[in-house]
Amino acid sequence: MSWYVRLARLSDAERIYDINMGSLGYDYPLCDTRERLEKILSRPTDRVWVVCREEDGLVCGYLHAADYEVLYMGSMKNILALAVDEAFQGVGLGRLLLNAVEDWARDCGCYAVRLVSGFNRVNAHQFYLHCGYRMRKEEKNLIKELY
């Protein structure tokens, strides 16, 4: 089977929604997913790539990344989401998506790509380590909901 990576389009929202539900367990409404995707696609600081099956263009995974600028280290790109449809995991699609963000980071002169992965996503941690990422630290993820 052959695959290709391209930048996401608003018409990809339904497949991104399906992948979020099936692979990540995020029950976020389709209408909201579409609205968020439209906003994200309009920002020059963000990129969303999808990996598609060559034979029919089916979106099988996606990666969302954005600029990461802090006052205590050089410029990076931050992976905010990487998910592959469970039916297509283990065939290299995640690696294709990582290649896309890493190329973008190099083109922008960034020194690194970073991400935060949930504590319970052990298989994801092994995947990232296999792709050359390293564990830097463990941290707590805090949130204060405003509404």
What do the PLM-derived regions correspond to, one by one?
Residues 9, 85, 116-118:
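Residue-level recognition of the GNAT/N-acetyltransferase active site
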Residues 3, 7-11, 18-75, 80, ...:
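Acetyl-CoA-dependent GNAT
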